[in-house]
């Protein structure tokens, strides 16, 4: 069952976006700090594939379960179904959300939308939440596209007044208060958590914003 409070502090990570640290340990520290949702995003140069990816996904899914935090898979619908993940998150160029809803009727489905043009072509009636961004410049995602700033967040809230919305892209602790003022339901973060020296403490500080 999805509710918008899950978006409050949404951590996204994979082995290629945690500076060579052990991903399991990184996620465990973030869970201890109080993340509300986790997305396994195994992409980019050197990303795990096949059995290695599957085994790690299962381990982290079980870890998230221990903390009652839903486990979302980025893009890989087959993996999400195979390991019975709590949901999937897809971009504009991935499989259509209407198709995913047929395959995963009871799961959480998230969709990335950057601007009004993408909004017009999106079947938002099939999704549980929308990821809006990139708000700021980001090193974590090489496919992120142009930044939208706070204005872009405000526009998306006007276009989707009732939809649970989470901001993404280059977000640091200092930005969170201003992002929430744009009526976002939460923030999704990659490197500001995974690169932190003390992940648990950083996450705690973020959740207090």
Curated annotation (Swiss-Prot):
Co-factor remark: Binds 1 Mg(2+) ion per subunit.
Cofactor(s) needed for function: Mg(2+)
Protein's GO biological process: thiamine biosynthetic process; thiamine diphosphate biosynthetic process
Assigned protein family: Belongs to the thiamine-phosphate synthase family.
GO molecular function, one term: thiamine-phosphate diphosphorylase activity
Binding sites annotated in the UniProt record for Mg(2+): 75, 94
Enzyme class name: transferase
Protein name per Swiss-Prot or TrEMBL: Thiamine-phosphate synthase 1
């Amino acid at each position: 069952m999805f509710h918008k409070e899950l978006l409050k502090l949404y951590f996204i990570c994979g082995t290629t976006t945690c500076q060579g640290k052990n991903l399991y340990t990184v996620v465990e520290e973030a869970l201890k700090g109080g993340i509300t949702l986790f997305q396994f995003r195994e992409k980019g140069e050197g990303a795990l594939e096949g059995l290695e990816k599957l085994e790690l996904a299962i381990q982290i899914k079980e870890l998230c379960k221990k903390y009652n935090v839903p486990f979302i898979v980025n893009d890989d619908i087959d993996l999400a179904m195979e390991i019975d993940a709590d949901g999937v998150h897809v971009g504009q160029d991935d499989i259509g959300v209407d198709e995913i809803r047929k395959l995963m009727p009871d799961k959480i489905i998230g969709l990335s939308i950057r601007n009004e043009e993408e909004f017009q072509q999106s079947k938002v009636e099939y999704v549980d939440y929308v990821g809006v961004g990139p708000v700021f410049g980001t090193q974590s995602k090489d496919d992120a596209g142009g930044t939208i700033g706070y204005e872009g967040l405000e526009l998306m809230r006007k276009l989707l007044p009732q939809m649970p919305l989470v901001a993404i892209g280059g977000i640091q602790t200092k930005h969170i208060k201003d992002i929430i003022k744009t009526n976002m339901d939460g923030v999704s973060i990659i490197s500001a958590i995974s690169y932190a020296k003390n992940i648990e403490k950083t996450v705690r500080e973020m959740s207090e914003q």
